[in-house]
Amino acid sequence: MALDIRGMCPLLQVFDMATSVKFYCDVLGFEIHATDQNTIAPDHNWVWLVRGDIHLMLNTAYEPEHRPPKPDPRRSANHNDTCLYFGAPDVDAVYASLQERGIKSEKPKIAPYGMKQLYLRDPDGFGLCFQWKAESKKQRRNENRNQLRSIARVGRRG
């Protein structure tokens, strides 16, 4: 029997839920889909975020009574190799939006394998990459040529 698997929803352990929710909702446009039932915002221990067909869960890394005053840098180092990749047809627009919101990142770059990518880190140090297949100059020339032909055909009909 074939497996019917639909979607995925990663779970990230975060140091400060309010900071993480603010980042994912206010900066990246996610909305809160569900929360734990025994807390009041912004003191949730668990949230389920959704943006279109992208799902992400956040859980506090510590129970409130055991949370240290500041994040342990070793904890961030342990997930330094974790990165969430988001499909973003207009990577430059994502970059501009992040800059408008005061989020620092390097400018998008085209990887050797042809993906235009923008990397940054969330408040807990998890890697985030917004990417899309980069158009080659030849593809852009062909698209422009096809658009001009379409315009010319419409002009001849009118």
Label each residue range with its predicted role:
Residues 52-56, 62-65, 91-92:
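Short, charged/polar surface micro-motifs in flexible loops or helix N-caps
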Residues 36, 69-75:
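Short, P/G- and charge-enriched loop/turn segments at secondary-structure junctions
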Residues 14-18, 63, 77-124:
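Vicinal oxygen chelate
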Residues 34, 119, 130-136:
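Short beta->alpha transition motifs characteristic of CBS
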Residues 1-21, 81-84, 133-158:
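N-terminal beta-strand motif that seeds the catalytic metal site of vicinal oxygen chelate
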